[in-house]
Amino acid sequence: MAQTNGELEHSKGMSSPAVRISQAQKSTKLTVDPESPEQVANGTHAEGEQPEENAGGLFQISVKLPHEPYKIQVMVSSQEQVQDVRQSIVELPSTFQYTCFHLEFNGKRINDFVELSEVPDLKADSEIVLVEDPYTEKEARMHVVRMRELVGAAGDRVDNIQGVNAGLSLHDAIAAEAAAGEASEKEHSLSKYEIAGSSSLKTILPRPETPLPKTVKSIALSPWNPAPYHLRQKGHLLYLQVTTNEGEQFQITSHVSGFYVNKCSNAKFDPFPKTIPKKRSAHSLLTLISQLSPSFNSSFEALQEANNQKDLLTTFPFQNAIPNNPWLVPAPSSNVNAHQPDITRSQENYLISGVDNAETLRDWNEEFQTTRELPRETVQDRVFRERLTSKLFADYNEAAARGAVLVARGEVAPLNPTEERDAQIFVYNNIFYSFGADGVGTFASEGGDEAARVAVGKDVLGIKAVNQLDINGLFTPGTIVVDYLGKRIVGQSIVPGIFKQREPGENQIDYGGVEGKDVVATHPDFVPVFEKLSKALRIKKHPVWDKEGKRHDLEGSVETKGLLGTDGRKYVLDLYRVTPLDVMWQEEEGSDVYPHRMSILRLELVESYWRHKMSQYVKAEVERRRVAKEAAKKEQSETAEPKEEGAEEKSEEALDQERVDISGFSLALNPDVCSGQVPQTAEEKEQWAQDEKEVRDTCDFLRSKVMPELVQDLHDGDVGFPMDGQSLSQLLHKRGINIRYLGKLAQMSKEKGARLDALTTLLVQEMIARAFKHIANNYLRNVPAPFVASCLAHLLNCLLGADVNANPRAEIDSSLREVYPEGDFSFEKATPASLRADIEKQVTIRYRFSLDAEWYNSLRHLQLLRDIAIKLGIQLGARDFVFAKADLPKTPVSNGVNGAGHDDSNSNKKKKKKGGDSNSPARAAVEDKPALSIVVDDIVNVVPLVKDASPRSSLAEEALEAGRISLMQNQKQLGQELILESLSLHEQIYGILHPEVAKLYHQLSMLYYQTDEKEAAVELARKAVIVTERTLGVDSADTILSYLNLSLFEHASGNTKTALVYIKHAMDLWKIIYGPNHPDSITTMNNAAVMLQHLKQYSDSRKWFEASLVVCESLFGRQSINTATILFQLAQALALDQDSKGAVGKMRDAYNIFLQQLGPNDRNTKEAETWLEQLTQNAVSIAKHAKDIQARRLRRINMTPRTLGTRVQPQVGQTAPESAGAKDASNTSLDSRSIDELLKFIEGGDTTSASRSKQKKRAAASNPKLRGSKKSSA
């Protein structure tokens, strides 16, 4: 796309991936442009790109305009389409007013959909002409919507899938605080920070902002709209009403020729031009308003200036992703979310989609399938196809989620109103909806509603896997699952022929089980495509038998169905059984029966098991060859003449390099074992038994290898530690572990002792939160909509607020209750005791784990509240939530609010311990009510939770993987080129705001950091923070890691005070989502300590080292090498703080531990001994070493893999080599900016550095939690 200030592409050359990839081998070094896009727009070249070289078809053209400034320059690429150039023009500040126009070259109109390379004679410095077009009604409506957004007259749209503050980013507010800190000479941001202090909920709330300059009072449709028939004949399209800042009201006619002021008043209709005092008209509404309002131009410039102060990413609209909805939002009474009057809000649907809404009705299924059939031969074809696919999935997911919410609320009429509620089906916006419940008894033998609910969730995962494989000739319907108010709703695009009445004797399904497993259909046309699918998913071709015992050979599970659509396409449906059942789980006796028989293995596990078996095969093959080689050598030595030594070495080398042929290896699992199939012959029974053994081996692999390895990795600190329920779930899923194993993992974690207390706490909390979710969903399913908040508040009080009120009563409006005589109000009967019993039962049944006797007394209330809110889609209004009677304010509580905004300095400290602060004012007192932790008014909103089947871009991932491989092979330039290409592809295909793009920003920022391009690293890390906040949440675990990365890069760039602000924010977030003393916070505290040393704040630095030591001792014990490493660092810090006595004491402790753990000859021990002697002998050596210490500590921190974000791609559970993406952990973790210093340091003959690096290798396996420290102390 053409470069504009409205688009965030890194360098113009990236717009032509076909050229770039083909030239990758010979291309020159390309650096990412970390500057704002405006600087690359309008004729400016990104570094490394020369226009005369026309690299990637890049050149500059001029555009002649009908109005000021009459001519602009635009950088374009020969690969992009004319419509991309149009978009560039629309986004440039000097050409904002144009929306309805076409482009001409040499007097001929250029088609919008051709590439620039196809325009005859168009070359560098050519001039194209912008010609204004007559408006149509649709163009006029779009123009009005666009102008309202530009001049800031558009208020917030009320949206049923985007909640309050959707897509919020706090980065700008934090950055402003950092900028103020950097500019001032005052104390740094950590000077009075309480490391073990309580969390403040203000951390995750938007900061109050200065209102933007107002350009007009309103732009709305006039009451005279729409135009009567006889005036439509004369070109009248719309009638508008504009009120300027001066208070004047103008009636405006939107005409095919443009906009003009008419003679209408509120009482008189005369839509013809007003000529007195003079005729006012313009092609653009923006130009017309500037003629009518004297203050408009200055206020519009002020608005643009104010918008330019913000990072463009924070205001960029979402295109290919659904924004994150924060769980905590400002209270409705606060000024931040005050509801403003805006008459046009109710008119926007008409402006966007016309009178009958027909413009937004799409044939989703046909769009999906025609997109899938697009050519994919060239790179350019693939870019276009994947870009379209990504946009289509995003549009469908949004439309389907909206419809699902309406279905859940009962606002869509069912197609079969006489059926039971769970069996009803709906069609809305060309999307077919049904409930994720067993309305027709399909899953009666599998567990009924529970099984159906799980099946539709697994179906989406299966469809996502098939979409990712992108098999030619196999089609899937667009599918989405939405959880909302206790209901699970499935939305699917309508497959042609799915509702068709078949002839007698014909099956509704063409391949697979028909209505269960009693009838099985086969069709020769499905065999080739299902064969490809099964091969990719490791599914074994196997026989199944129908109710008459007849054998049918199927490529997939009997549950997976093939349907030949009336459009001639082959569709695959019901993909919830693409992996086998977890046989061991089913057979394992729990105290209660598991709720369903849909407990299947994860695809990640099957892939992991396949790699494991292949590895065994390769080892066996290598061993077989070695034995054969030795036997052959023995024969040769007896018979043949002796070879020359060199020739023998060469032949051996050739044999070593020979690759093992894995074509003889195959592993495929039968998904239908243990599912009621009855083999008929002895041979079939034998084969079936073999299939069952393979599945059992896979289950055993999960239990005996995957789960123990994960627990051990977390115990040893080999991987990033999860912070909350979401990051824990991601970690388990990545390893192929199902959530039902939370209980087993908790038992294994407990057995490991105190070091994994943090993991045990997280696992138990996740089980409780999920049990509560199931219970709440059961209550919510039939609760009338106005009582949802009452139900949720009451259940939360029973779980979290029993100490404040042991017998909470649901707040229900009795007069409103009478309106719903058939509503289900059973939630009222819930008590703290009954809810605890229900949770214990759910945990026992679902996770086969017994909670401790008084588990409810050790809850982490705020963290559990957050987890539950995220799982149920609740948005809570912020205030001081009180969960303990001791923290209640002493004054009488009005309206059950518990003193929100209560300003008692004595109780404030106590209150903050549990909940945090709030800037919302106290609500007006109405009457005294019993104290409650959560009141109905706290439940501001409930948002739908969406599970989609959108595939990732294979092209962008291929470019990224090629870049990584090149870097691993030390082809730095090519690797950078390919990774930049991948970034361009990510941005083109996904759009800017997407979690996948955020991950890539992380990785790329790390790459630039390692290559000493610090500014680019900081810029990309900043983008990673904003995109992560907006797509994953302002307090997600990924956001914390993004801020920590950014802090390191800022520090490396010399902005240490800024870095400390980001660390402070990350620590504050940590307190909210996990609480204090997270295992990974040790490294962060060390970072902070080193940065403070850099600022010569030795006293504060020492406090952070001491805090790090406390956490380390609690996790690893007093006598661990990790603790010794921190003691060593702390002793140095004390020396810098002139505390020689303390320094000697800590260094002695470190020496004793090293001596005990590593022995007297280890270099760690020797170095500690040397330091100890020097510190003890005299204070002179302290002064002598002071400068060395500071410099060396800085190097240490930069060598810390974990600190530098070895998890640059922010996934908890990633190991160091994985995240580095280029080299092994020890290499990637080096701070490239100090590589030269390091070399000088080592060459200078200082033994301490060398000795410690060797120790690190010895100690890493057993104590990698502080690998950074070990390196540094190494």
Swiss-Prot record:
Family: Belongs to the CLU family.
Keywords, ordered alphabetically: Cytoplasm, Repeat, TPR repeat
Molecular-function GO term, any one: mRNA binding
Subcellular location(s) of the protein: Cytoplasm
CC per GO annotation: cytoplasm
Gene3D superfamilies referenced in this protein's UniProt entry, alphabetically: Hypothetical protein (hspc210), Tetratricopeptide repeat domain
Keyword field contains Protease: no
Provenance organism: Aspergillus terreus (strain NIH 2624 / FGSC A1156)
Claim: Acetylation is one of the keywords in the record: no
Residue ranges, annotated region (Disordered): 1-53, 631-655, 893-925, 1197-1274
InterPro entries: CLU-central, CLU_dom, CLU_N, CLU_prot, GSKIP_dom_sf, TPR-like_helical_dom_sf, TPR_rpt
GO terms (BP aspect): intracellular distribution of mitochondria; mitochondrion organization
TPR repeats mapped onto the chain: 293-326, 510-543, 628-661, 998-1031, 1040-1073, 1082-1115, 1124-1157
Bias kind Polar residues: ranges: 1200-1217
Protein name: Clustered mitochondria protein homolog
Assembly information from the UniProt record: May associate with the eukaryotic translation initiation factor 3 (eIF-3) complex.
Stated role: mRNA-binding protein involved in proper cytoplasmic distribution of mitochondria.
UniProt xrefs under Pfam families: CLU, CLU_N, eIF3_p135, TPR_10, TPR_12
Domain Clu: 342-586
